[in-house]
Each structure stands twice: as C-alpha cells, then as structure tokens.
Amino acid sequence: MTHLKITGMTCDSCAAHVKEALEKVPGVQSAIVSYAKGAAQLALDPGTAPDALTAAVAGLGYKAMLADAPPTDNRTGLFDKVRGWMGAADKGSGAERPLQVAVIGSGGAAMAAALKAVEQGAQVTLIERGTIGGTCVNVGCVPSKIMIRAAHIAHLRRESPFDGGMPPTPPTILRERLLAQQQARVEELRHAKYEGILDGNSAITVRHGEARFKDDRDLSVSLNEGGERVVMFDRCLVATGASPAMPPIPGLKESPYWTSTEALVSDTIPERLAVIGSSVVALELAQAFARLGSQVTILARNTLFFRDDPSIGEAVTAAFRAEGIKVLEHTQASQVAHVNGEDPQVATVGYSEAEAHHDGIETDSRTLTLDNVPRALANFDTRGFIKLVIEEGSGRLIGVQVVAPEAGELIQTAVLAIRNRMTVQELADQLFPYLTMVEGLKLAAQTFTKDVKQLSCCAG
C-alpha cells in the first residue's frame, strides 16, 4: 500500500473528487481517501510513478506528498497528463485544430466551464434558449439578496433597538419602485459578468436557441430567431440547471401559487403568504415578505434546518416567531383551496457533530452564544451562536456552525482555519481585531480552555 498526505480538502465531497482523480491515474488499482485524516491509501501496480499521483491531486487544487517522503514541487509536464486522464484536451498534443467544446446552458457552471476550456485552448460554442446568465444573476442569488436587503432596511426602521433615542418609524413600502431598482441591478450584473464577457471572448460563440443531440458528435440547435444550425463537438457539457418541483398537493395547480421565480419579480406584497417548505430559499423569502408587510406562515414538514445541528433550527425558529412569522413544524399541506438570507443568517462549514459521528470521528464541541461577543452587545443584537466542532485527541477544527446577523461574513475565516488544518488552540492564539463579529470565532475557540466571561475586553 502507498500512503499520501493530502492538504487543502475541506469536506467529504473534496475527498470523493480526489479519489476519482487518483483512480484515473494509470497504475492505480484502488484509492481510499479520508477528508478527516487528510490522507489517501492506494493499491498500485508495480512501477507506478509517485509524481503522477501528486500531480493528479494538484490538478484539483490540493497538495499531496508521499507519507514517508519530503515534499517536491517538481511536477513539470505532469499536469498535461492529468488533464488527459480527466478527459480534457492536451494543448501540447500537436492537434491540427483546437478541441471543440459545446456547452448547453449559460449559468454559473456553464460559464466557468466555457472560460476554463478556452483557457486550455479550446473553441467553445455556448447554447442558451432563454436569458443569458442562468438562475443566479437573473432569478436567484442576485435579486433575492437585493430583496432581502430592502426588507432588512424596512425591519431596521420598524424595530429600532435604541428606544426613545431613535424611535422606530413604520416604513412606506413602494414595491414597484423596489422591483425596478432590483431589476436594473440584475441587468447591470448580467451584462458585466455574463453577456459582456461572452461578447469579448473571440473563442466563444453564443447561439440563442434550443439544443438537442443529433448524434454523439453533433447538436442540432433550433434558433430563437428561426432556422436550425448544427454544432459539431469533441466534448459536450450539459449545464442546464434545475427547475422547482411542485409537491403533489390537491388544488395547488389550480391556485395562484408562486415559485421563487415569481416571488422575486412580483410587483405587489400579498396580504397573506403561506410558504410550503423550510429550505434556505423558502426561509429567506418568507422573512423578506414578512418584513415588507405580509402575514407569513411557514409550513415545515420537519423542523427548520432539520439536516443541520438542531440548535440552528431552534435559533432561527425563535427569531422568526419573535418577528411575528408563524412557524408550523411537523406540518404538511394536504390541500389548497381553489380560490435564505434569513436574519439571523445561518452559515456552516465542515462537519456537524452528527456527521462526524456517522463517519466514525470522535468529537468535542463548544457553543458560544452571541451575548458573549462584545460587538454583538454593541450592536444590540445578540441573536444566535457560534459552535465549533473539533476532532477529539488532535484538537483539529473540523466543523463550524454559525447563526448570527453576519454569519456569512464570519464563516470565511472558519473555512480558512479548517482548510489549513488548524487546531482549536491555534485558532484561539490568533490575533483578531477587537469589537468585530469575527472575534467571536476566537472567543469560541477559547471556551475549550477558558471561561470567556472572566476575560476583559482585549484579554486572551
């Protein structure tokens, strides 16, 4: 058996990709890759080059070295071989023409693949039957975050924490104007990040139409402007995304229901809104509409965030109910009459305790409520917590769960800590700027060895 040390993996999915890459290297019989151990165990044919193994891992953006050998950066020429094993074109192969790549779709995955293919020397034809940009910029991340931001400002005006010094004022919501501002920014970003990039890249040809496979080397594209065009390819990526699934509830199809797509472009705020589901998208929109004036009821088949640490769902449910949002847990809609980012935010990385135990990893953990974070106190907003999960024995940080108004900003520091295989003590020993929310990570790390309630503001 040959053993590799691998750094840079952040989750089990990373390990799965590394395993797939290693098993494509000639001479590798099998590979067992563990994210938790940062290691791989391989069965090899005699004469298999160790450098080929480390290059395969490097091709995914991670670092690998033989467990019993010093590190080496001498990988000249191996990356091209890795690309070949992964099914990509070898720019140095001396081919008479560039690799022809067809990409069906124009969202984030399609764009990333098209640009990477061009970077490696390919010619790309990108086919889109609808609006360039896919879900995120048009009907997903961008408009939803703009709407959530508007709803957050409405909430701040309505719920001032400063009592008589800055009395709250019920906001006037002009949804039509908010929608116009939202869509203007959507169009701006779509042009800047998608249309403009495609127009400026001579190696990418865009066809507006619907594609179907003619055979294993040709696509037939029914152009939106009329007519058909055949697109020949050496490689084809189908990156068409997904669409909402409608639950089989009697009467739903006959009702004026929304998916997230319709909700984000509605020019009215409904008086009452029932949200069926408890996914991030459902909860983000539920809270946004509640803050903009709707009476919102969430129907959750289980609890909120039931796949995560239970304390996350409990904290978000309490926050929603405090805002007047009805949360009905363990409830399923049986019939319809015929007539996110949620706040506080939720951010997680790595293992939850349950996931670690499922994978056979013994853990220890600490949870720091935000009333122990000075910046949260200064903000008059102590909703939420920071939870750190470590590997028992080694003390290595393997998971972080955060519920906080700025959870999305905090989590990147946790990502870096896990990616660099830091121990909780190493995290506790870092210098963090005082009176910032991210300081909460240091304080949470300190709770493994100290009572942070007994520390002065800048001590530790």
From Swiss-Prot:
EC number: 1.16.1.1
Keyword set includes Metal-binding: yes
PROSITE patterns assigned: HMA_1, HMA_2, PYRIDINE_REDOX_1
Residues that hold a metal cation according to the record: 11, 14
Class in the EC hierarchy, top level: oxidoreductase
Record domain HMA: where: 1-65
SUPFAM superfamilies noted in UniProt: FAD/NAD(P)-binding domain (SSF51905), FAD/NAD-linked reductases, dimerisation (C-terminal) domain (SSF55424), HMA, heavy metal-associated domain (SSF55008)
Reactions this protein catalyses: Hg + NADP(+) + H(+) = Hg(2+) + NADPH
CDD domains noted in UniProt: HMA (cd00371)
GO molecular function: flavin adenine dinucleotide binding; mercury (II) reductase (NADP+) activity; metal ion binding; NAD(P)H dehydrogenase (quinone) activity; oxidoreductase activity, acting on a sulfur group of donors, NAD(P) as acceptor
GO biological process: response to mercury ion
Pfam family, one: Pyr_redox_2
Free-text function comment from the UniProt entry: Resistance to Hg(2+) in bacteria appears to be governed by a specialized system which includes mercuric reductase. MerA protein is responsible for volatilizing mercury as Hg(0).
Family stated for the protein in its record: Belongs to the class-I pyridine nucleotide-disulfide oxidoreductase family.
Protein name: Mercuric reductase
Organism expressing this protein natively: Serratia marcescens
Gene field: merA
